[in-house]
From Swiss-Prot:
Protein name: IMP cyclohydrolase
Gene3D superfamilies assigned: Inosine monophosphate cyclohydrolase-like (3.60.20.20)
Pathway participation: Purine metabolism; IMP biosynthesis via de novo pathway; IMP from 5-formamido-1-(5-phospho-D-ribosyl)imidazole-4-carboxamide: step 1/1
Single GO MF annotation: IMP cyclohydrolase activity
Keyword presence, Hydrolase: yes
Family classification: Belongs to the archaeal IMP cyclohydrolase family.
Enzyme Commission code: 3.5.4.10
SUPFAM superfamilies, A to Z: Archaeal IMP cyclohydrolase PurO
Cited function: Catalyzes the cyclization of 5-formylamidoimidazole-4-carboxamide ribonucleotide to IMP.
């Protein structure tokens, strides 16, 4: 099944996977603790605004944010200004809305912290829910948050776990795990 990009958020960890039929030549790089999706060196040039973005950011030792696009940055910024996680997620998703591409691709994002949330904004809905167990939401087919499993405790292993899920067209994945008073991040580019 092709579900597109997806996230899994749990109370103490989260992960994000890029799945793509159209733009498979992407990878994740670590830029001082911020994980960024971008094209590989052999990727064809494109003016598509949805190809490169920060997919995982931490906000001090308090929060981690994951998502499938540029909404990660304003969510992190609002959290750093003291917004509650639910409000930072809802306001940023609502402000940016779904992606204005040929598919009206939903934006998905999650926050891990003292309170953890998952959210999506689609053409027909804005959904933000508290997370008590591992919860998945995807851009296609699984566009409503639903319970799932999440086993790994190491961020890179968590990313590999999502990459290896039996869902079509994996490209790369990112993971974050709460480690006491801070967060550890990792990624997997299928190598």
């Amino acid at each position: 099944m092709y579900v597109g990009r997806f996230i899994v958020v749990a109370p103490d960890r989260a992960a994000y996977r890029v799945s793509s039929r159209s733009f498979p030549n992407r990878r994740i790089v670590d830029r001082d603790g911020t994980l960024t999706v971008g094209p590989t060196e052999d990727a064809p040039e494109t003016d598509n605004p949805y190809i490169s973005y920060n997919c995982l950011r931490t906000v001090g030792d308090d929060y981690a944010v994951v998502g499938n696009g540029t909404q990660v940055d304003p969510i992190a910024e609002k959290l750093s200004l003291g917004y509650p996680p639910r409000d930072a997620l809802a306001e940023s998703l609502l402000a940016l809305d779904y992606e204005k591409d040929d598919y009206d691709t939903p934006r998905i994002a999650g926050v891990v912290g003292d309170e953890s949330y998952i959210g999506t904004v689609r053409r027909d809905a804005l959904i933000v829910e508290a997370v008590e167990e591992p919860t998945l939401v995807a851009t296609y087919e699984k566009s409503e948050p639903e319970p799932t499993s999440l086993g790994a405790d190491d961020p890179s292993e968590l990313a590999a776990e999502l990459y290896d899920r039996d869902l079509e067209h994996p490209v790369c994945a990112a993971g974050v795990v709460a480690d006491g008073d801070s967060f550890e991040v990792g990624y997997y580019n299928g190598e």
